[in-house]
């Protein structure tokens, strides 16, 4: 499967050192020091349950000199007392975790960060100011895939494609072999393995318009999702389908 090289920039920004234009290490170091923060992606996703919009996720992804920062805010659009959540994910240029933070308007927060050879999660509940701690025997290269934040799925797609795709003859050649990832779900205080696989191009309706997008499947022990990204626009996530939950997520 081949795709336009125009998408390489976004793939490279978060996890694709192998796809970056080759240069001497000293030159890259100097360029990294001088590079200003760059907006990689921003926007919002509408989250629909049985066809009704129930929440909106607003997000931004910034590439800085030596790190990437992914910020997201989730706001419920239904209910008399809607709850909002926000998350901040910071990673190194090679995709290793620096820090993850989550909080919600009704109280409660958590942080995750590397601690020696494992990850440490600190959880503060609305009823207690003293945080509980939970270690995970996982490397800092593990992906964060928290509940309700679909931008985390976009970052995982880029990470998968960074490993699966290589420049060849002016195009990007992608293997369709599945990729396995160890991920942490901070709100659930659990870790798991997930598998992502490139399916290929499909025509699908997005906001009433037929689009040709690239489909990937994301699977775990108890879930099976379909994700569609736009190869013409830096592999940005456009749609997610979660059939078991009657849920669809669409970029606004």
Predicted segment positions?
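Bacterial N-terminal signal peptides that target proteins for export
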Residues: 1-11
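Helix-centric, low-specificity signal for extended rod-like, repetitive segments
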Residues: 2, 21-22, 146
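Bacterial N-terminal signal peptides
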Residues: 10-20
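Acidic, serine/threonine-rich low-complexity disordered tracts
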Residues: 25-126, 131, 162-252
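Acidic/charged, solvent-exposed loop-and-adjacent secondary-structure segments enriched in E/D, K/R, S/T
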Residues: 123-149
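Beta-strand/loop-rich accessory regions of lumenal/periplasmic or secreted enzymes
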Residues: 139-177
């Amino acid at each position: 499967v081949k795709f336009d090289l125009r998408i390489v920039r976004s793939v490279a920004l978060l996890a694709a050192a192998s796809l970056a234009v080759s240069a001497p290490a000293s030159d890259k170091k100097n360029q990294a020091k001088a590079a200003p923060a760059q907006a990689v992606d921003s926007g919002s996703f509408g989250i629909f349950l049985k066809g009704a919009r129930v929440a909106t996720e607003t997000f931004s992804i910034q590439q800085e000199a030596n790190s990437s920062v992914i910020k997201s805010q989730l706001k419920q659009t239904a209910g008399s007392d809607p709850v909002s959540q926000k998350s901040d994910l910071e990673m190194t240029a090679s995709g290793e975790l620096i820090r993850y933070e989550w909080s919600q308007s009704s109280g409660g927060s958590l942080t995750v960060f590397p601690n020696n050879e494992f990850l440490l999660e600190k959880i503060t509940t609305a009823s207690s100011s003293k945080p509980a701690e939970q270690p995970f025997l996982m490397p800092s290269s593990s992906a964060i895939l928290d509940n309700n934040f679909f931008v985390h799925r976009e970052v995982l797609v880029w990470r998968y494609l960074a490993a699966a795709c290589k420049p060849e003859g002016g195009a990007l050649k992608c293997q369709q072999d599945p990729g396995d990832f160890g991920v942490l779900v901070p709100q659930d205080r659990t870790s798991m393995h997930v598998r992502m696989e490139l399916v290929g191009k499909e025509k699908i309706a997005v906001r009433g318009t037929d689009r040709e997008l690239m489909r990937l499947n994301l699977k775990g022990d108890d879930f099976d999702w379909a994700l569609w990204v736009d190869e013409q626009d830096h592999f940005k996530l456009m749609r997610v389908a979660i059939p078991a939950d009657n849920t669809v997520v669409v970029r606004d």
